[in-house]
């Protein structure tokens, strides 16, 4: 690579980094300033963080929203990883005549937008009496086609010789999965956990539909409630967005290596 191309590449990377970091910096500045300072375009962190936090706690049930969001995200992550990893493993390891047909159905399901099945899903949840429960939030997403495809792709690198040796030693199929497949596929589980947790935490439309009581409020719903029809406290709103963003940012930073390895198909 010539010197000019290196300079151009670094310039593009610097610009991309700035465009990625600036919204976070602006959000941090907004969380520490008053609404007047934000409207005036102040780009220096202020001293109103505590005041904005007191206003947020006084106007919204922050603790309840955080607890509900963590509960929903953790439950969805655990159940989705279990179901999708077993399904992906089964699609690749076991051979059956109906496997190709089922895979075609799975691929077709990936093409359906959520809004196309949202009303039927809500009617099902209402018929089963699950509205306003965590089950209504978790059940429609436990068999995500993308996650099944991810684990199926990862299963292709799982050596068949190990499976046959384990069977000869008398290990059950569930034993092979939990004692051999799961430890080897740590990177894939890390990537799947990151994506699932972030999707569950940031979900707004479906929780807004199935959670119809104030006791079931989540963090995205709380942030939406900070905007009234007549006035907006931008400092409090920015702080709410910042608090809502922190858990997913921490999860991604902790699992970024596993995320990269899992998405690219690395097995360690």
Q: Could you say what each language-model-derived stretch is?
A:
Residues 1-3:
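Short, Lys/Arg-rich, polar N-terminal cytosolic tail immediately upstream
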Residues 5-268:
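A structural signal for multi-pass alpha-helical bundles of membrane permease subunits
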């Amino acid at each position: 690579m010539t010197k000019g191309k290196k300079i151009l590449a670094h310039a593009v990377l610097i610009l991309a980094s700035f465009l990625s970091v600036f919204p976070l910096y602006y959000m941090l500045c907004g969380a520490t300033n008053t609404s007047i300072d934000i409207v005036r375009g102040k780009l220096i962190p202020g001293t109103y963080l505590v005041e904005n936090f007191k206003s947020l706690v006084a106007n919204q049930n922050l603790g309840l929203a955080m607890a509900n969001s963590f509960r929903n995200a953790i439950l969805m992550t655990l159940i989705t990883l279990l179901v999708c990893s077993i399904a992906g493993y089964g699609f690749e390891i076991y051979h059956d005549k109906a496997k190709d047909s089922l895979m075609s159905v799975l691929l077709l399901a990936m093409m359906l937008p959520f809004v196309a099945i949202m009303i039927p899903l809500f009617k099902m949840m209402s018929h089963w009496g699950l509205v306003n429960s965590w089950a209504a939030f978790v059940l429609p997403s436990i068999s995500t086609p993308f996650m099944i495809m991810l684990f199926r792709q990862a299963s292709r690198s799982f050596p068949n010789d190990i499976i046959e040796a384990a069977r000869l030693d008398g290990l059950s199929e569930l034993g092979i999965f939990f004692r051999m497949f799961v430890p080897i596929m740590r990177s894939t589980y890390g990537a799947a956990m990151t994506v699932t947790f972030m999707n569950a935490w940031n979900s707004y439309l479906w929780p807004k539909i199935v959670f119809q009581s104030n006791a079931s409020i989540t963090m995205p719903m709380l942030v939406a409630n900070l905007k009234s029809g007549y006035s907006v406290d931008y400092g409090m709103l920015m702080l709410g967005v910042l608090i809502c963003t922190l858990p997913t940012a921490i999860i991604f930073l902790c699992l970024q290596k596993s995320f990269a390895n899992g998405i690219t198909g690395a097995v360690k």
